[in-house]
Design a protein with these regions (language model features):
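Conserved N-terminal beta1-alpha1 strand-loop-helix module at the mouth
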Residues: 1-139
Length: 139
């Protein structure tokens, strides 16, 4: 069984959940979410809000970090993967197989070797399940 806790933002919460031995922690990078992990402005541009940096660096096995994105521009995904050292990218929008394939080629091996990509697909009928076949080989 794999346990993923999603929507984490607070450093103390991340520490506590990590101590429980969860496998993955999800960081929401969708601005419309109340659990959105924001980037903060600096004079040199946009940098990640690293207030919680190192919160899971206590000698224990670190949970894998999953970045959750909805219809985000690929360059913003690449920036977040790099800045947050994400292990997984989870896509919840209308991302095409071509976009996902291009994203993977950009990230692996140069920026984040071995990164995993998850594509969430809403299923309401049998045709939606068939649509999943379009993503074979790119996720």
């Amino acid at each position: 069984m794999i346990i993923k806790v999603c929507g984490m933002r607070d450093a103390d919460n991340i520490r506590a959940v990590s101590a429980l031995g969860v496998d993955m922690i999800g960081l929401i990078f969708w601005p419309q979410s109340p659990r959105y992990v924001r980037m903060i402005n600096s004079r040199s541009g946009i940098i990640p809000d690293k207030a919680g940096e190192g919160v899971v660096d206590d000698g224990l096995a670190r949970p894998k970090l999953v970045g959750v994105f909805v219809d985000e521009m690929p360059q913003n995904i690449v920036t977040r993967v790099y800045n947050y050292t994400l292990d997984y990218v989870q896509l919840h929008g209308h991302e095409s197989p071509t976009m996902i394939d291009n994203l993977r080629r950009t990230l692996d091996p140069d920026i984040r070797p071995g990164i995993k990509i998850i594509k969430a697909v809403s299923v309401g009928c049998a045709d939606d399940v068939e649509r999943c076949r379009d993503y074979e080989g790119c996720v």
